[in-house]
Swiss-Prot record:
Cofactor: record remark: Binds 2 manganese ions per subunit.
Protein name (record): Probable cytosol aminopeptidase
Role noted for this protein: Presumably involved in the processing and regular turnover of intracellular proteins. Catalyzes the removal of unsubstituted N-terminal amino acids from various peptides.
Reaction(s) the record says it catalyses: Release of an N-terminal amino acid, Xaa-|-Yaa-, in which Xaa is preferably Leu, but may be other amino acids including Pro although not Arg or Lys, and Yaa may be Pro. Amino acid amides and methyl esters are also readily hydrolyzed, but rates on arylamides are exceedingly low; Release of an N-terminal amino acid, preferentially leucine, but not glutamic or aspartic acids
Gene3D superfamilies associated with the record: Leucine Aminopeptidase, subunit E, domain 1, Zn peptidases
Lineage: Bacteria, Pseudomonadati, Pseudomonadota, Gammaproteobacteria, Pasteurellales
Naturally occurring in which organism (per UniProt): Haemophilus influenzae (strain PittEE)
Pfam families to which the protein is assigned, alphabetical: Peptidase_M17, Peptidase_M17_N
Length: 491
């Protein structure tokens, strides 16, 4: 889809004009102008009750006298001054649904006149594009009959505001990153294994002059002492690979980088502590942390942000086997701490603890890890907010600000010293689980033992990384949050 922002005349020929109307006869400037061009036809529709402004209600008019546009699509925007981001996205989805039923190739949107509560025109345009791209997403790679695609090619926003071009640029890059994350995450685990993740990282680096790649294989991990990471991989014939993408684009090439670390369990059966069969297929999504880091790196490369950023995809697979690690094993991690394994299904933190130690070599400005880490986080927060744990208030607040800006929501969980008590082991420095209570927090507390040398935050996306049911599939979260956080670091 090609997106543009420019002033257009209502008399201009096009396939379709999209116009918003509020409830209680609150009309926009363009509504009144079109009403004059059509000799009061729109007001007649209002008086007859056909046009009410009810949220997401649409009416499609064709070949109106006085308009060169083939169609006029009017959409209800609810009460003026009360339109939220969520409602606005419903409006865009309603517009798309109606347009899909026509052969519309070009649209001129006057929804730029619609006011979002506490938002400016930049967000009006950015939310529109991101919603369009997210709604139009299809993953039919393995279907013999492909999904019907929209014929819509051009979407023009009626404005010449300077912010509009920036909104289009940001939205295009973030949407591209989200799509990349969704595509990788939706791949079946017989194809998307750690080697496949590394191959995708290689392709991304080869297609960007600003990105470079280093792949750490099991032999190098063994030399580095990444025994916790390697233990998780022992039950699988698919070897572990940790892909390290480097984006070195700050004016000062030696500036400390921001590091993103993504959990990349391409399939998690739980190992010897085997998961129940129900919904186990969804454990292909246990690499959504790595997928979101991949998508974020793609987005910032497209935006050419003047930052130094490193993205780590910690690829691994957790399966039961005669060689698999066991409950009761004691592992020596890369930083020297020992961990007693009480549950092999608490494997993500074992992979991450060594990855978090590995990135110390970059002397990072800060580190954010992203992981589908705990079912406890889903129980606590549901499927709307990612869980945030951090030892740094400024970093946590910056991430929450980005979450609010993008509506890629997050909620901060506490991380006080008491939670470390639950991780005590009689045989090792730490246990890999902390008991029944506060599981999302104790998982974060476990990771905090490996982040003493830098500012750190942890995002648990177990509830937000994918959807179940009829709309089953990866969401691409939190690419939007992470990219916005990085955009904000430039300001």
């Amino acid at each position: 889809m090609k997106y543009q922002a420019k002033n257009t005349a209502l008399s201009q020929a096009t396939d379709c004009i999209v116009l918003g109307i509020y409830e209680n006869n609150k009309f926009s400037k363009s509504f009144n102008e079109i009403d004059q061009l059509t000799q009061g036809y729109l007001n007649d529709l209002v008086k007859s009750g056909e046009l009410t402004g009810k949220l997401a209600q649409t009416i499609l008019l064709r070949d109106l006298q006085g308009l060169s546009a083939k169609r006029l699509l009017i959409v209800g925007c609810g009460k003026k001054g009360e339109l939220t981001e969520r409602q606005y996205k419903q409006i865009i989805q309603a517009v798309l649904k109606t347009l899909k039923e026509t052969n519309t190739r070009e649209v001129i949107s006057y929804l730029t006149e619609i006011e979002l509560k506490d938002r400016d025109l930049y967000w009006n345009i950015r939310f529109a594009i991101e919603t369009i791209e997210h709604t139009n997403y299809q993953f039919d790679h393995f279907k013999s009959q492909k999904a019907e695609t929209s014929v819509l090619e051009s979407f023009i926003f009626n404005t010449d505001c300077n912010q509009a071009q920036q909104a289009i640029s940001h939205a295009n890059a973030i949407s591209s990153g989200i799509k990349a994350a969704r595509d990788i995450a939706n791949m079946p685990p017989n194809i998307c294994n750690p080697a496949y993740l590394a191959e995708q990282a290689k392709n991304l680096a080869e297609n960007s002059t600003a990105l470079s790649l280093k792949v750490v294989d099991e032999e190098e991990m063994a030399k580095l002492g990444m025994n916790a990471y390697l233990a998780v991989s022992k039950g699988s014939e698919n070897r572990a690979y940790m892909s390290v993408l480097t984006f070195n684009n700050a004016p000062d090439k030696n500036a400390k980088p921001i590091v993103l670390v993504g959990k990349g369990l391409t399939f998690d059966a739980g190992g010897i502590s085997l998961k129940p069969a129900a919904d186990m297929d969804e454990m292909k999504y246990d690499m959504c942390g790595a997928a979101s880091v991949f998508g974020t790196m793609k987005a910032i490369a497209q935006l050419n942000l003047p930052l130094n950023v490193i993205g780590v995809l910690a690829g691994c697979e957790n399966l039961p086997d005669g060689n698999a690690y066991r409950p009761g094993d004691i592992l020596t991690t890369m930083n020297g701490l020992t961990v007693e394994v009480l549950n092999t299904d608490a494997e993500g933190r074992l992979v991450l603890c060594d990855a978090l130690t590995y990135v110390e070599r970059f002397e990072p400005e800060l580190v954010i890890d992203v992981a589908t880490l705990t079912g406890a986080c889903v129980v606590a927060l549901g499927q709307h907010n990612s869980g945030l744990v951090s030892t740094d208030n400024n970093l946590a607040n910056a991430l929450l600000q980005a979450a609010t800006e993008t509506t890629d929501k997050a909620w901060r969980l506490p991380l006080s010293e008491e939670y470390q008590e639950q991780l005590k082991s009689p045989f090792a420095d730490l246990a890999n689980i902390g008991g029944r209570w506060g599981g999302a927090i104790t998982a974060g507390a476990f990771l905090s033992n490996f982040t003493k040398k830098y500012r750190w935050a942890h995002l648990d996306i177990a509830g937000t990384a994918w959807l179940q049911g009829a709309n089953k599939g990866a969401t691409g979260r939190p690419v939007s949050l992470l990219t916005q956080f990085l955009i904000n670091q430039v300001k």
